[in-house]
Amino acid sequence: MDHDIWRQLTHDLGRALGELNEGQYLVLSIRGTNRFVQFAGEGSLGMLAEAASNHYLPRGERLDDAAHCRLLQLGWWAPTHEPEESGPRAWGGSPNYFLMMEAPVDFAMLAEIAVGALVSVYGAKDPRQLEYRAFSRCGDGIEFPVLGLAPAEQ
């Protein structure tokens, strides 16, 4: 594995996260899979980040106990509820692994945690396997050329 290309992606992702405004979303995934990390700009509140849990992974790609432990070691919080659960619950929970980072957000650290999940948990071998989607709350597409990744085909 070429550590320099992952360091570059981590740096570039940190820059992209710093450009993510309130009501904007960025999803990085391994092409052809549902293995992802995603970010939601929350303005003055900070940023919500999520990493795919078994709720969203097909049977053959589900995370084992070692992967669960690795996500926790990286700094992710464990999922708090099932996707279909409704009703009141504590703000900040998620059916995915997640982090709610208050402002000011340490974008470099968040990028490091996210890339760590893509590589050491979800199995990305090369950044060229990754693609991204970015959009606003209204559904408008956003481009992040700083990432050096291909946008996902719509």
Regions found by a protein language model. Give the residues of each.
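Extracellular, modular beta-sheet/disulfide-rich ectodomains of secreted and cell-surface proteins
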Residues: 2-3, 7-11, 15-40, 50-51, ...
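Acidic, proline/glycine-rich low-complexity IDRs
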Residues: 1-6, 10, 89-154
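Hydrophobic, Leu/Ile/Phe/Ala-enriched alpha-helical segments that form helix-helix packing faces
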Residues: 12-24, 71, 75, 114-122
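Intrinsically disordered, low-complexity regulatory segments enriched in Ser/Thr/Pro
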Residues: 32-105, 123, 134-135, 154
